[in-house]
Amino acid sequence: MEKSEKELTPMLSQYHYFKNQYPDCLLLFRLGDFYELFYEDAYIGSKELGLVLTSRPAGKGKERIPMCGVPYHSANSYIAKLVNKGYKVAICEQVEDPSKAKGIVKREVVRVITPGTFFERDTGGLASLYKKGNHYYVGYLNLAVGEFLGAKVKIEELLDLLSKLNIKEILVKKGEKLPEELEKVLKVYVSELEEEFFEEGSEEILKDFGVLSLQAFGFEEDTYSLPLGAVYKYAKTTQKGYTPLIPRPKPYRDEGFVRLDIKAIKGLEILESLEGRKDISLFKVIDRTLTGMGRRRLKFRLLSPFRSREKIERIQEGVQELKENREALLKIRQILEGMADLERLVSKISSNMATPRELVYLKNSLKKVEELRLLLLELKAPIFKEILQNFEDTKKIINDIEKTLVEDPPLHVKEGGLIREGVNAYLDELRFIRDNAETYLREYEKKLRQETGIQSLKIGYNKVMGYYIEVTKPNLKYVPSYFRRRQTLSNSERFTTEELQRLEEKILSAQTRINDLEYELYKELRERVVKELDKVGNNASAVAEVDFIQSLAQIAYEKDWAKPQIHEGYELIIEEGRHPVIEEFVENYVPNDTKLDRDSFIHVITGPNMAGKSSYIRQVGVLTLLSHIGSFIPARRAKIPVVDALFTRIGSGDVLALGVSTFMNEMLEVSNILNNATEKSLVILDEVGRGTSTYDGIAISKAIVKYISEKLKAKTLLATHFLEITELEGKIEGVKNYHMEVEKTPEGIRFLYILKEGKAEGSFGIEVAKLAGLPEEVVEEARKILRELEEKENKKEDIVPLLEETFKKSEEAQRLEEYEEIIKKIEEIDIGNTTPLQALLILAELKKKCSFSKKESGA
C-alpha cells in the first residue's frame, strides 16, 4: 500500500510528482551516477533488463520499496532494450549541481523516448495517420536522418507505403481502428492521441515554418498539415530540448518508381529471406557500401527502383566507369572507409547530444568529403558531374573544430581536456595555475620576502584555513599594512592578502573552472556548427549517392556482372542469368536463359519440387529489379524493358497471423495483381491454386492465364505443378511451356536445374519424397498407388473428351458435366471487376454446387 505524500522521503515525493505526469512511461530517475527505477517500473526493469532488484526505505516506518538501476553513462544500451520491447521511457534528470543544491536536487523530465523517437540507436521512423474518405494522409518523420515526408494513399496501399518507410511507431486519433494487418505484419507500436493534438500540431507546424499553408512546400491539400503537424508536435513534445533539427516537409513522390508492394518485397527476398533471415537477402548479398548513408541509399533504391530509362542509364554509366577504372574505385573506397554517418551526426549535433569526439569525427569526415570531391573532378560520367553540383564548402566547420578541439578529446564533454591551448586566454591561465600551483606560490612567496625584507616569511596551507602567510614574532614589526591577521600562534602569526586569496581561489577551483569554461566554449562551438549543418546534410546526400554507385561497381567488378541494356520496348531477354543470392551459397550454379516477347509473354514452368522452378522465376524478377536501380547483373547479356511494376505471388507469409486461409490469401494477392498489372508489368506467380483442391487449382490457374493473355498482356512467369496448365500452349495467345530438366538414374533422379522448352514429363513426386528420406515402405506404397492411378489414366487420351464419351449416360458423366459447369462459371468470372466480398460469395456458391454433386452421387 502506497504511503501518503507526508510519509514519503522528499526524494520519493519528487519521484511521484513526475511519475504522475508520465504514467504510461517507465521513469528513469537520476540519482547521482545512476538512473533508478522504482515500484512497478523496478519489477519491469528487473525482468526485461536482467537487473538485480533491491529496495530502499520509503520514508517513516519499516516499509521498503523495490528499486533497480543502471549507470547513467551506459544508459542508452538499456533504454534501447526497453524501447525495442515496446516501452516508453521518460528521463528524469538532475538539472542542478547536487553540491550546490539547497535541499532536494532539482529534477525535470528532459525527454521521453518512444520506439519512433529513439534516434541515437535506430533509423526507424515515426508515422502519423489521418483518415479522410477512402484515403490516408501520412506524416513521416525520421529524426535519426532528418527525413520529413507527407503522403496520400488509398487504404489498400497504406501497408506497402509504411513497409518501405521502416516505421517503428504510428500515431493515430484515439479510438480510430487501424487496418488489422498494420500492427500484426509491421509489428509497430501504436500511440493514440486526442484529435486536438492533430489540430494543434497543424497550427504549430505552419507557425514554426512561417507559412500560411503547406502548399508552399508542394503539398496539394491543406489536410496534409494534420498528420505532418502531429508527428512534428509529438517529436518536439517528447524530445523537448533534445529535438534534432527537423527539415521542412517534402511530398513523398512515387510516380517515378517501379511499383513494388510488400508482397514483392517479401517474395523476391529483398531485405530478408522467406524464413526471415537477413543474412541471405538480396540487400545483404549485394551490399558493398561503406557508409551508413550509402547503405540507406542502397536499401531505398532496392525498394523504389527507377522507372526512368534516362535515370537508370546515368547510374549505369557511373558504375561502368568505376568498374573499368579500378584505381579510381579503390581510391573512393579508401576515402569512404571510416567516414562517419553524416546524416546521423547532423541529428545528434542539432539535438545537443553530440560528444566532442563526434565533432572530431565530423571534422575528419568532412575532410574526406573534400578528398572525394576532388577525386570526382577527374571522372567523366555525367552522374558524377551532377553529384559534384551538390557538394558544399565546409572549410569553415573544419577549421573551427580543428582550432577549438584537441584531436583526441574525452568521450564526455564535462570531463575537461577537450579545448586546445590558445583558444581562450583565461582557460590557458587556469590550466597553468592548476599545473603550476607550487611554482605560483613560491614565486609569490619570493615576491613578499623582497617587498617586506622578511627572509623567514613562508606560505603554508591547511584544510581549515587554506593558504596563509606565516611570520615569526621577531619580524612582526616589518609586516605591511595590507597583511590581514588570520591566526596567532605562540611563536608566529599567520596572515593573508587579497592577492593570496585570489591565488588560493584560482588554485583550489581551477579544475572546476576549467571544466565549466571548456563546456561553455564547447557549446559555443556546437552552436556555430549547427548554423552550418544544412551544408553537412547536402554533402551527406552527395556522399550517399557516390557510395551507392561505387557499391554497385565493386560487386560488378568482383562478380564480373554484365551491364543490361535498358529499353522502352516490350521484350525481356536474359542470357545465362543467375540468381545473385543463391549463387553466393551454391557451388556450380547453373545459369538459364529467358526470353519474354510478344509471341511468348506467359511462360508456364513445370517440373518436380526442388528442380528449381521457384528459384528461376524469382531470379528473373531479381535481375529485372537490379537492372532498374542501375546495377549490373549476373548474366552474360541482358535486354531489360522498363517496367512499371513487379508483382509476385509467392508463399502465404505473415497473413496466417491474421486468420486468413492460405487459399483466400492467394486469391486476394492474385486479385491485386490482376486489378493493377499492365502490359508494362512483370508478374511472378509461384504455385497458384495449391491451397485448394486439384480441380479448383487447375480451373483458377487456367482462368488467370487466360485473363492475363487477353486483358493485360503482362510479361508473366507461372511455376506450377499442374501439368494440365501446359495444355494452354497453342490455344491461348502468348503461352509457352518450359520445364526444369531432370535426369533419371538407376538410383532415382538427378536435378539438372536447366530450363528447357516443353512441358515436364511427370512430376517425380515419389522420387523427391525418397530423396527427402521418407521410409522405404511409404515410398513403395506410394509407387503402388501411383501405378494403379496411371493404369486408369492411360485409358484416357484426353481426360475431358474421353470421360464425356465413356460416361455419357452414366451417373459419373452427369457429375462431370456439373464439374464442367463449375469450371465454365469460374472461367467466366471477371476477376478484374470482382471485389473480395463478391469473390467470397462466388466461392460459397461454387462450394454449394460441389456439395450438392457429392450428395447426389452418394459420395
Curated annotation (Swiss-Prot):
Disulfide bonds: none annotated. It comes from the Bacteria. The keyword DNA damage applies. Belongs to the DNA mismatch repair MutS family. It holds the Pfam family MutS_V. One of its GO terms (molecular function) is mismatched DNA binding. One of its GO terms (cellular component) is cytosol. CDD domains: ABC_MutS1. PROSITE patterns: DNA_MISMATCH_REPAIR_2. ATP binds at residues 607-614. This is DNA mismatch repair protein MutS. InterPro entries: DNA_mismatch_repair_MutS (IPR005748), DNA_mismatch_repair_MutS-lik_N (IPR007695), DNA_mismatch_repair_MutS/MSH (IPR017261), DNA_mismatch_repair_MutS_C (IPR000432), DNA_mismatch_repair_MutS_clamp (IPR007861), DNA_mismatch_repair_MutS_core (IPR007696), DNA_mismatch_repair_MutS_N (IPR016151), DNA_mismatch_repair_MutS_sf (IPR036187). The gene is mutS. It comes from Aquifex aeolicus (strain VF5). This protein is involved in the repair of mismatches in DNA. It is possible that it carries out the mismatch recognition step. This protein has a weak ATPase activity. GO terms for biological process: mismatch repair. Keywords: ATP-binding, DNA damage, DNA repair, DNA-binding, Nucleotide-binding.
